[in-house]
Regions:
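Conserved, ordered domain cores of eukaryotic regulatory proteins
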Residues: 1-70
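Catalytic core of Fe(II)/2-oxoglutarate
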Residues: 71-72, 81-157
């Protein structure tokens, strides 16, 4: 199922997908020589994103994700069994029902966001990339996503 996130990113932000794909390839090549345990783990890594964090049974006050880059899309995936959770993005004046199974992609650095405290077992997975990993690997940073880039990507399919 996590391959769907990577495939979604390839449509929503093709240049970010390509940059991350290049980063993961280079990381695999580097680790094959320098860190066999990392190489073994990367063979089973489920997504194009370089980082995954799990947030369990807690609210997330409004914040920005400063380790990411403003023009990159992070993905939040909610799982578990809970109700009445709201994802708040106040700078856009948006509040979303954040039910189990919801996937949201946006710039976690650019947009302040947070979720309320809920009853039940609440778990979210945050998929993101770290600028320092891309810089260390020498992978060029992707550009801002623009509508013409999506049109070009879809035309090439």
């Amino acid at each position: 199922p996590l391959a769907i996130l990577s495939a979604s990113l390839s449509i929503m932000h093709p240049s970010l997908y390509n940059a991350s794909h290049q980063a993961m390839q280079q990381l695999s090549e580097w680790s094959a020589t320098n860190d066999p345990k990392m190489a073994a783990a990367l063979r089973h890594w489920p997504t194009i994103y370089t980082n995954i964090s799990m947030i369990a049974n807690r609210s997330a006050p409004l914040h920005r994700d400063l380790q990411s880059h403003a023009d990159w899309y992070d993905m939040l995936v909610s799982v578990s069994n809970y109700s009445e959770c709201v994802l708040d993005i106040p700078s856009l004046g948006l509040q979303f029902d954040y039910w189990p199974g919801t996937v949201v992609a946006f710039s976690g650095r650019l947009l302040r966001h947070g979720v309320n405290d809920v009853s039940g077992n609440c778990c979210s997975l945050a998929f993101y990339m770290r600028d320092n990993i891309h810089n260390w690997l020498g992978v060029p940073r992707s550009d801002w996503m623009r509508v013409p880039l999506v049109s070009q990507a879809l035309a090439g399919m």
